[in-house]
């Protein structure tokens, strides 16, 4: 069972929210027009409503560890949408997922799990 989560790791929560702002508000505008979200909420409130986990990698990992669905998943898919990160920012976030977030969730790279042959 694959589970998808929107995450946005950054140096801190304020940086993550600043980088998320344009993409989230563009998405929210459509959702408000369709009656799926109320108007007038703060950016942080909209991120909570959209289940966007953002902040320092340790904060993101802690939020994911508290997710009651993840223990039942066989696959975990991360996405950055509705944010529109640059290629360099997306690469940085992928590196943070692999080196800081995923290990806190119990993931190990293939290189770490391979037993050397004698």
What spans do the regions from the language model cover?
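An alpha-helical appendage that flanks or caps ligand/catalytic pockets
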Residues: 1-75, 87, 102-118
């Amino acid at each position: 069972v694959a589970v998808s989560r929107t995450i946005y790791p950054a140096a801190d929560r304020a940086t993550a929210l600043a980088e998320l702002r344009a993409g989230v508000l563009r998405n929210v505008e459509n959702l408000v027009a369709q009656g799926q979200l109320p108007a007038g909420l703060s950016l942080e409130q909209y991120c909570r409503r959209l289940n966007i986990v953002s902040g320092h990698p340790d904060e993101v990992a802690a939020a994911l560890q508290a997710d009651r669905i993840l223990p039942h998943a066989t696959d975990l898919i991360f996405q950055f949408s509705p944010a529109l990160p640059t290629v360099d920012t997306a690469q940085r976030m992928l590196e943070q997922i692999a080196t800081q977030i995923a290990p806190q969730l119990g993931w190990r790279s293939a290189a770490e799990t391979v037993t050397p042959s004698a």
